[in-house]
Amino acid sequence: MKAYELVVYPERCHGCGNCVVSCPVNAKHPETWGGKGPYSDDVVIRVENGVVTVVNQDLCGGCGACIEACPVNAIELVFKRK
């Protein structure tokens, strides 16, 4: 079990997709760079219905690229207490 969880605050998210493009896990999907969201479930996050959604928490490496890319602070890593 990871010591952190990627949390999205949908009320803040504008669905710009900056986080999706910045994620190194998502980068392996060519459609990410074409301006489309990845269709595979083998990604960490994607935009669905105008809001970023965590698709696969287990793939998140905790690098924080998505957090840095978000202009509205809609994403954060929440560290779990032991």
Swiss-Prot record:
Keywords: 4Fe-4S, Iron, Iron-sulfur, Metal-binding, Repeat. Gene3D superfamilies: 3.30.70.20. It comes from the Archaea. Binds 2 [4Fe-4S] clusters. [4Fe-4S] cluster 2 binds at residues 60, 63, 66, 70. [4Fe-4S] cluster 1 binds at residues 13, 16, 19, 23. PROSITE patterns: 4FE4S_FER_1, 4FE4S_FER_2. One of its GO terms (molecular function) is metal ion binding. Its cofactor is [4Fe-4S] cluster. InterPro entries: 4Fe4S_Fe-S-bd (IPR017896), 4Fe4S_Fe_S_CS (IPR017900), PSI_iron-sulfur_center (IPR050157). Residues 4-33, 51-80 form the 4Fe-4S ferredoxin-type domain. The keyword Hydrolase does not apply. Pfam families: Fer4_7 (PF12838). The keyword 4Fe-4S applies. PANTHER family: PHOTOSYSTEM I IRON-SULFUR CENTER (PTHR24960:SF79), PHOTOSYSTEM I IRON-SULFUR CENTER-RELATED (PTHR24960). This is Polyferredoxin protein FwdG. It comes from Methanocaldococcus jannaschii (strain ATCC 43067 / DSM 2661 / JAL-1 / JCM 10045 / NBRC 100440) (Methanococcus jannaschii).
